[in-house]
């Protein structure tokens, strides 16, 4: 009944208007699982390969080659297989690709099929996706890390850091956390507008004002939190995604917005000072992806008081994560499914992190779709944290709304992660 009988890939558009892959997996019982593949703007050099067409069509960003792989080789390989055998299906696609980074068929082709297979299997068994993936123990609603000011490659402004996040650690439920975030988001908009700043939003729904420094952005957020009646640090904590690889060149960190250049030790000291000054409990990619020495210095400096998240550093890759664990670099990993390319490898990265007492944070990408898969994945893995953008743009809100539904479905079993930093 759960045998795969057809797979259909197609080219659609993501939240930035760029092509991406959508996949339908048809089962013998008539069930169809549909999945969409996200895409990032700031990509780590060690990520699995997202196959693009090149040429003039869509300015080279078309995905017809990836779609052809879905409708051709992958279809031929998987027809007749049982959708419930997720690991075997993922391994078959990895073997079919035959490269270490999924460069031949494309991680965007392989991931689309992998996720659609899981959705089809879950529906066939009449199970919510989070329950199918996570089993009976899946019950933790993640604390959202809400990106309300965008910078870096996510926005057309001069802020060097990519994301400034609010984290509703003091909420009692996921639904309440979303309310906290929405209220602060709208207050921030008012304060920015009153100060004469642009209130257009960036790729992830956060505002993108012309600030010259990280401190200026943080101060506006702090004022908005207080004006809403919340207590910084107690009810609302802060988080940063520095995306440092984007401004790391020749061993130094070049802050164009500030007109400053910091060496590795100065970068560590700067981040440590920010943590001392503000209620910052998490910093993502504080050091560049290949600055392993810097990561070790940063972890030794503030790793006991602040969550240090490796995104470009680890790229959801268990092997790179194990290297980081051995070195004592970072203490957490960001989980982005398209960085590695299959659901089973994603789950393996989460398990690897948890076994080493590293935290795992489920994350969206800047180029998203209406697919809410990561909301279910966050609950399935009991990770306790999710990054899925601001409180604007339907591609971001689709995930928050799905989490609200899941919390309702779980009823008394639901547990909001809240202040995981305690």
From Swiss-Prot:
Binding, (2R)-2-phosphoglycerate: 162, 336, 365-366, 387
Cofactor binding note from Swiss-Prot or TrEMBL: Binds a second Mg(2+) ion via substrate during catalysis.
Binding residue positions for Mg(2+): 241, 284, 311
Names of the cofactor(s): Mg(2+)
GO molecular function, one term: magnesium ion binding
Residues annotated as catalytic: 204, 336
Keywords in alphabetical order: Cytoplasm, Glycolysis, Lyase, Magnesium, Metal-binding, Secreted
Top-rank lineage group of the source organism: Bacteria
GO cellular component: cell surface; extracellular region; phosphopyruvate hydratase complex
Cross-referenced SMART domains: Enolase_C (SM01192), Enolase_N (SM01193)
Record InterPro entries: Enolase (IPR000941), Enolase-like_C_sf (IPR036849), Enolase-like_N (IPR029017), Enolase_C (IPR020810), Enolase_CS (IPR020809), Enolase_N (IPR020811)
Pathways involved: Carbohydrate degradation; glycolysis; pyruvate from D-glyceraldehyde 3-phosphate: step 4/5
The enzyme's E.C. designation: 4.2.1.11
Places the protein is found: Cytoplasm; Secreted; Cell surface
Similarity field: Belongs to the enolase family.
Name recorded for this polypeptide: Enolase
Taxonomic lineage from the root: Bacteria, Pseudomonadati, Pseudomonadota, Alphaproteobacteria, Hyphomicrobiales
The gene coding this protein: eno
């Amino acid at each position: 009944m759960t045998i795969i009988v057809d797979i259909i890939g197609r080219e659609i558009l993501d939240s930035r208007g760029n092509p991406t892959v959508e996949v339908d997996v048809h089962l013998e019982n008539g069930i169809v699982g549909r999945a969409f593949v996200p895409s990032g703007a700031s990509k780590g050099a060690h990520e699995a390969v997202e196959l693009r067409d090149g040429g003039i069509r869509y300015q080279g960003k078309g995905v017809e080659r990836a779609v052809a792989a879905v409708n051709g080789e992958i279809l031929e390989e998987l027809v007749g297989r049982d959708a419930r055998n997720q690991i075997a299906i993922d391994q078959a696609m990895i073997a079919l690709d035959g490269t270490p980074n999924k460069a031949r068929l494309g991680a965007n082709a392989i991931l689309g099929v992998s996720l659609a297979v899981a959705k089809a299997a879950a529906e066939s068994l009449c199970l919510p996706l989070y329950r199918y993936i996570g089993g009976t123990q899946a019950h933790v609603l993640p604390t959202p890390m809400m990106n309300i000011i965008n910078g870096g490659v996510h926005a057309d402004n001069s802020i060097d850091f990519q994301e400034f996040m609010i984290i509703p650690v003091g909420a009692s439920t996921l639904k309440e956390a979303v309310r906290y975030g929405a209220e602060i988001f709208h207050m921030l908009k008012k304060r920015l507008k009153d100060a004469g700043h642009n209130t257009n939003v960036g790729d992830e729904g956060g505002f993108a004002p012309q600030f010259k420094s990280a401190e200026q952005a943080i101060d506006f957020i702090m004022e908005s939190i207080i004006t809403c009646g919340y207590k910084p640090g107690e009810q609302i904590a802060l988080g940063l995604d520095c995306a440092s690889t984007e401004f790391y060149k020749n061993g130094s960190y070049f802050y164009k917005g500030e007109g400053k250049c910091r060496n590795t030790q100065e970068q560590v000291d700067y981040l440590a000072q920010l943590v001392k000054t503000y209620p910052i409990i998490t910093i993502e990619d504080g050091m560049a992806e290949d600055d392993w020495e810097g990561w070790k210095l940063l972890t030794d400096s503030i790793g006991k008081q602040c969550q240090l998240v490796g995104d470009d550093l680890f790229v959801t890759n268990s092997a790179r994560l194990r290297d980081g664990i051995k070195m004592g670099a970072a203490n957490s990993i960001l989980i982005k499914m398209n960085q590695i390319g299959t659901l089973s490898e994603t789950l393996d990265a989460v398990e690897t992190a948890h076994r080493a007492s590293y935290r795992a944070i489920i994350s969206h990408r800047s180029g998203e779709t209406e697919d809410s898969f990561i909301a279910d994945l966050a609950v399935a893995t009991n990770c306790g944290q999710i990054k899925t953008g601001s409180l604007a743009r339907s591609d971001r809100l689709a995930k928050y709304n799905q989490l609200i539904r899941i919390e309702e479905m779980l009823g008394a079993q639901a547990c909001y992660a809240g202040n995981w930093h305690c």
